[in-house]
């Protein structure tokens, strides 16, 4: 129904890690060749807190440790090491601007923390969800961080999304942020509705 390519993502499951895994752009014309580089998916905020001992602060501690392991500040032989050899090799591709990390996150304070972390670690990020991203739109534009929003997500589904609104995409674009669309439920069978939700974004100021 007019969908020529898709970004296949990896989701963090119950009992898993805030690092969901890798995904990539794929073509839907029968070609087996990828349509773009790989992307690493990370879950932060209240949803990620359930995967990090119930602590938002614990998420950043874990991320910093993973980076320290890749950069050799924590030896691979350390009993405290979290990454496997394959994990270190994979994460290394995304450091110092070598790849894009897509972060599922909503709350403005968490997004602000993500921007500080990404700048400190030299990591390129994109935001999935971003219900309150409009509150830090100038910072996102300056950092050239794209945001993928659900134009229909206008309800405070949890305390991370109190600032959700139908005009989120319009506010972000007005500030110079690159905007894309994604369904909140991430259901692949709803990919065909992306054009409809784009129309909703236009109807609300985009």
What residues fall within each predicted segment?
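Polyanionic/metal-chelating signatures
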Residues: 2-125
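Catalytic beta/alpha-barrel core
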Residues: 102-107, 124-132, 152-158
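Short secondary-structure boundary/capping elements
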Residues: 83-86, 106-109, 132, 160-164, ...
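Hydrophobic residues within beta-strands of alpha/beta enzymes
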Residues: 6-8, 147, 180
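His/Asp/Glu-enriched, well-ordered alpha-helical/loop segment
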Residues: 100, 141, 150-154, 159-206
